[in-house]
Amino acid sequence: MSLSNWPLKKEQSKAHNIKSTKQITIPDGLWVKCFDCGLLMYSKVLKRNLKVCPQCSYHFQASSNERIDQLIDQGSWEPMDVHLISTDPLGFKDQKLYSQRLKDTAFKTSLQDAVQTGVGTMLGQKVCLGIMDFRFMGGSMGSVVGEKLTRLLEKATQERLPAIILCASGGARMQEGMLSLMQMAKISSALEMHKKENLLYLSVLTSPTTGGVTASFAMLGDLIIAEPKALIAFAGRRVIEQTIKEDLPDNFQSSEYLFEHGFLDLIVPRTQLRSKLIQILHLHTNNN
């Protein structure tokens, strides 16, 4: 090679190296970074640990389908009212029509609304289970959520079964106005009928549980259980501080703070939740 061609060859070699580097790609979703401690881990490692960080025990949000897989005996799940869908009684529109938002969210999540309900077994013990899903419009409680949970509790009362509801919600769904707010009383009324039959209701609060859900069925459990460091509140922290003109503690509205002040009965890590629920169910069954 002549000396005059050497710079050209060098540039071609550099371009080849750059091209080769660009071809190295990492598949989307392969890695997950913990929001709390910053640990970088394989997604499958996180999933295997029930979406709990193996280093700091931070609890990632879990979908309703993941919750069913985590809690219910394999092959025993019988879903209820899967075809119930919300209408748009107010013709509500913000950035888009509410009716279109429902369709878009249903397509994205493969859910019809923000709760799944059904009957299954936990180590052979039959239970009625409702699982709210924060992915569907922030787990907001509209007429379908209220109707599905009410039907679930009525079935539990009729068949004399314990009921468990896993809460994950931003509160009442503003797009349905008063129809959303009335679900608080509707579900609470069904719970009262369940209670009069001396049947067990367990409320499990996950992050976040706020607004009208907190103000109704989330806090009506015979035992109220929460995941660690869950955000549990009615109004937002900033709203309260501006109203009372005082600074709030750093851990205010956390499950640990509420436990210390007597609002919760148990704080149970997700990895132990199934075994703890089974233990409570068996204690209740053996004493009745």
Swiss-Prot record:
GO terms for biological process: fatty acid biosynthetic process; malonyl-CoA biosynthetic process. The keyword Kinase does not apply. Residues 30-288 form the CoA carboxyltransferase N-terminal domain. Zn(2+) binds at C34, C37, C53, C56. Keywords: ATP-binding, Chloroplast, Fatty acid biosynthesis, Fatty acid metabolism, Lipid biosynthesis, Lipid metabolism, Metal-binding, Nucleotide-binding, Plastid, Transferase, Zinc, Zinc-finger. Component of the acetyl coenzyme A carboxylase (ACC) complex. Biotin carboxylase (BC) catalyzes the carboxylation of biotin on its carrier protein (BCCP) and then the CO(2) group is transferred by the transcarboxylase to acetyl-CoA to form malonyl-CoA. This is Acetyl-coenzyme A carboxylase carboxyl transferase subunit beta, chloroplastic. It comes from Porphyra purpurea.
